[in-house]
């Protein structure tokens, strides 16, 4: 671990540690954005399910978890990592989400053209998560723990999102559900990780 990273981790155990005022303000601002997007993500997931028809939303329905190239949910070990590494992983996931959300929106425009609210929500989610990712990267850079290079955008989902067969449509709906779920998981995780840097925040 570098000396800079060590200083960042010391914040978790040393209550006297404080950031420069402008950095503290940026952390609070980014944390507030993550908290707001966590709320929006719950609404997006609910709205998405409502628009997919049966069996989505039925009690006991458990859709298969289809793989997504370049993105998965936070690993169980995530919480045990140093906060700087957690934020790096958050930033990487957030950078991958806009392209996936855009792909879901395009497919939903074909499947549910009369659901403008859902389409707008997906468009807003892609824009907002892009802004959150940029803000997290700014915080990391200011802390001397910048993200380790760009993450390639996932491209292997295109065939599943565009197939018009019955199986392809169902898979596209399931993938969209998965993307909306991952969006919620990562913005919530980002909120929690940033909360450890906010003065008075809880671990």
Swiss-Prot record:
SUPFAM superfamilies xrefs: 4-helical cytokines
Keywords: Cytokine, Secreted
Family: Belongs to the IL-6 superfamily.
Origin: domain of life: Eukaryota
Name recorded for this polypeptide: Cardiotrophin-1
GO molecular function, one term: cytokine activity
Cellular component per GO, a single term: extracellular space
Residues spanning the membrane: none
Subcellular location: Secreted
Reported tissue expression: Expressed in the ventricle and atrium of adult rats. Also detected in the lung, kidney, liver, skeletal muscle, stomach and urinary bladder. Not detected in brain, colon, testis, spleen or thymus. Overexpressed in the ventricles in the case of hypertension and hypertrophy.
Keyword Secreted: yes
Function of the molecule: Induces cardiac myocyte hypertrophy in vitro. Binds to and activates the ILST/gp130 receptor.
InterPro entries, per database record: 4_helix_cytokine-like_core, Leukemia_IF/oncostatin, PRF/CT
Protein species of origin: Rattus norvegicus
Classification via Gene3D superfamilies: 1.20.1250.10
Pfam families with a match to the protein in the record: LIF_OSM
GO biological process, one term: nervous system development
């Amino acid at each position: 671990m570098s000396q800079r990273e060590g200083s960042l981790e010391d914040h978790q155990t040393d209550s006297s540690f404080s950031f420069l005022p402008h950095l503290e303000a940026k952390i609070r601002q980014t944390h507030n954005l993550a908290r707001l997007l966590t709320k929006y993500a719950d609404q997006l997931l609910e709205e998405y399910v409502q628009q997919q028809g049966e069996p989505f939303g039925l009690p006991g329905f458990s859709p298969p978890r289809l793989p997504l190239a370049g993105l998965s949910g936070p690993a169980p070990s995530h919480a045990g990592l140093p906060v700087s590494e957690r934020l790096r992983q958050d930033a990487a996931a957030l950078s991958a989400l806009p392209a996936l959300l855009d792909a879901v929106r395009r497919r939903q425009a074909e499947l549910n053209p009369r659901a403008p609210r859902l389409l707008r929500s997906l468009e807003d989610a892609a824009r907002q998560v892009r802004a959150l990712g940029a803000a997290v990267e700014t915080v990391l850079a200011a802390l001397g723990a910048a993200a380790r290079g760009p993450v390639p955008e996932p491209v292997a989902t295109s065939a599943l999102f565009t197939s018009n067969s019955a199986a392809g449509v169902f898979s596209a709906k399931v993938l969209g559900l998965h993307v909306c779920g991952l969006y919620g998981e990562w913005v919530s995780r980002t909120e929690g990780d940033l909360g450890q840097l906010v003065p008075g925040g809880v671990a």
